[in-house]
């Protein structure tokens, strides 16, 4: 494997995994998710993913206009978000690729391309660990 690991986050799936009213403001919920990822490039997601890390948040639908910020590239899918994530995995075969989703079909598609898959709880647990350590 070459280069910086690539963390690909399924925004719709991760946002939708927590019943916190996201459906009232999908762009806002997606921006909040993006902001929780700001420290991943420099901190990683211990212990599984040490830094540095490239982070790509894949968005679609009502969240398409959420902008990128330094450290988190937001990719608005031209077609389906799942297809965009598979294309990202396929485009970087020499890198370690981690996809965050609970979507079973997407999990199968990206693992067939050699990616690792983690569920939304993995990211939420990271945030909980970070808050408890500060």
Regions flagged by a language model, labelled:
Residues 3-6, 14-134:
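Nuclease catalytic cores that cleave nucleic-acid phosphodiester bonds
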């Amino acid at each position: 494997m070459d280069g910086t690991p690539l963390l690909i986050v399924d925004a719709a799936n991760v946002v939708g995994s927590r019943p916190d009213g996201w459906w009232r403001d999908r762009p806002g919920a997606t921006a909040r998710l993006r902001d929780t990822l700001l420290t991943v490039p420099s901190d990683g997601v211990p212990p599984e993913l040490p830094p540095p890390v490239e982070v790509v948040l894949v968005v679609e639908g009502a969240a398409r206009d959420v902008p990128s910020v330094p450290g988190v590239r937001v990719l608005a899918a031209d077609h389906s978000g799942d297809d965009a994530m598979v294309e990202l995995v396929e485009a970087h075969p020499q890198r370690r690729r981690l996809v965050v989703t609970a979507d079973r079909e997407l999990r199968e598609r990206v693992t067939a391309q050699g990616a690792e898959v983690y569920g939304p709880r993995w990211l939420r647990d990271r945030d909980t660990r970070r808050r408890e350590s500060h």
